[in-house]
């Protein structure tokens, strides 16, 4: 206690709480100890500490005396007083700490079935509540308690452990006994039965620190541990290695203080306590003999220091804000729901009921040689992470909790087959199982073999049946012109220029395709690579196939040039001639055709079949409606942007990737004329496969100029290959495809043909490509200057892809990854990109429209506000609806006029700008005041201010009262009004009011005004002009209405001669009773809606 008090006196942070002293009261040897304790508690001024375990009576005494009770060992249950005014604070661990810790592990490992083991001895009240809280938590979380054993730790529990082990896998052992005999015995028995070593069992143990602190503290000096000792396993059939395996599936929980950590404060306190230990503890234990061998209760010492520091911090906080600490209900608010910084270095919390939240220490075994082989070491702490976050979490020490399960994973709470084998069938005879298994395996093998043979048979039969052959009578030939006419290409020229142009292009293209599908002729030479023109038939030059009157079917097919178009099974197909008079379909040919028919991908042209009727041989393909990539590149009216080029590049690479991974294996003839464009503007590769059939073609070039033109995209190694493409390996052709891809990219981004502006003839270019490298010269390639405006990654890719050595060329995957920046954000096809562009434009347009609508609404609101400032709201609403606003008669209303006597003289002696500022300031004040009344401001002319009530919305007889109350408010306001340029002058406001019938209506087209007409208006004006400054001159008719309303003080002025009116009896309105007006308005608001805007004044205005 003295050490703790000395620490507080030395704490400079405690600004108003210092110079403490200790008042000890030892009642252990006095007569009537209970009476002495009661007297001591009654003498407490603010708080008392050091209450006993059963502190109910002591806390009650302090509660009755409105004093604070701070206990570090009290075990009473505050649940019975929660919700009532109380003054008790409990600093020891709570009974639900074990339940929260156990639920942490059960939730973490999803254990839903457990066994609960505890001593059979009578429990203390505190231990009983701990067990009760644990049972409640297990029930609330739907945890099945398979076993609930209450055992004598000193008896033989072998049979009971064996019985429990057959019913459960996860054990919760709560041991409140000294030396934890039940926990040791139970764990070692499970180990002796080889249950723990199997990894299927787990023990979550609890040791009461209160009954085991001596051996827990004495085990290892500063580093407290759970020491089970070598001698403990002598009576069991266990080795040290067995013990290590057992410990892997054991976690121990304890409610003691944290173990020693590198905490200078706690270490200093321990040193001071140990130095003081041999001395006689007087005070306070002057009548008691203290053993020098007693083990210090570090948990009690920790709680004592924490309690004193906690009470000091709370008192200091209360005094700093001026709180009265002698008033317990106020001081108690500073004690609850606050953080407690323990001297051990951890953080704890006091809840809203004055009880500490508590925590739980975790012990686990480590196999490190630096640790005792028989001990479990403190590795973590379970506690609440903050005052508001009630979920418990781990606070790691230097070791940290890492459970090394026997089987490397947490055991299941239920065996695979259940505890009684209910989840598995009965055991079967092994011989029978083996025979059945072998039989089933043989049958499955035979079935697989039969299925394979049947599939093979069907495949061979299909190959033999020439499934791909098409009877030419099933194809209807069509005339052809130019598929992609100049007009169509021009309509596509602005495909990426703007969204509007793109939309128009879609409509144009759709119309063209429909025309074509209906009947228009078509030029198939724009679909596949060309090499010759239409041949002359027996009837002379043929302008188009199928167009010669009287020609036979054979003649029509024989007159088809390199390419044709027809209708097959309801769809348009392309016909490509193979220059062979006949074809003998060998097995290898049929296999190659089968691979072609299996190659289906969105980036390759579909193979439909073949037409073979000597001497004509055609391959039937799916038709690409928009021609080839070369057609587009050769058309100067077709602008190409980066999106177009990037999408085309993406499609070409995707098609090649598919072919290289498909049974076809390669392309072999990649060029821009074989990159076809379909209706969705997607590139689809054609003219691949059939290498053996096409390798034997016999047609010749038309002239020398065209010779070598089809070989401008071919790689050097294939040009040198004398045996033809059909004899090349797939890998070599794949590398050749990479070279051809480079030429296509050069053509696509340069747009000057496959070899740019090279002036040589194609056959000369092919010859140089084929021979230059062999002669030791630099390989001949297109001029890279053509691509100077292209992206750098494209230039680098082209150069790498047309490298002379095929093995040094990049793979398609590498090329795709290199060019990925070009395709980021692109859709699947160009058409999808166009749709995306339209959608973005639409979204932007909708956003712009919404913004314009918001601006329009804002301006509309301003216009309406301005209109309502010029005209009454009901009149303005009628005008907005287009209704005619006719003049309206009002049976009764009150008109108000006011002016400022002396205004003319002021105007003569003041600057015009000063007069303007004066009137603006005055009327601004007036306008703010009239908003509080059910009145309408008609107009202002110079210093004259005109207001009316009872129109345009009638309000019964309240119009006279609203005008009178307004006049009183204005007179009150001018008392404090300052004239800027004449600060010493006062505004002497003169007011006149009159009630009676009136006619009102809108007058004029330009700057229309709501005007009032009638004798009532004239009389009100005379009342104002014949009035007295700072007075409200009231007519007799207005006075009668005010008398009916009540609450107004009216003084008779007398008869006044008025111009045009003769003699009139007049009155002064002197004041009002605001309570009567309030009651009147509240009562009549439902009847007269216009009264809702009238604000009730809290003051009564009176003038003498």
UniProtKB/Swiss-Prot annotation:
| Gene Ontology molecular-function annotations | ATP binding; guanylate cyclase activity; peptide receptor activity; protein kinase activity
UniProt keyword Glycoprotein, yes or no = yes
**Which tissues does it occur in?**
Expressed bilaterally in ASG sensory neurons.
Q: Which Pfam families match?
A: ANF_receptor, Guanylate_cyc, PK_Tyr_Ser-Thr
Q: Name one GO cellular component term.
A: plasma membrane
Q: Which family, according to UniProt?
A: Belongs to the adenylyl cyclase class-4/guanylyl cyclase family.
Any domain commentary?
Answer: The protein kinase domain is predicted to be catalytically inactive.
What protein name applies here? Receptor-type guanylate cyclase gcy-15
What is the organism field in this record?
Answer: Caenorhabditis elegans
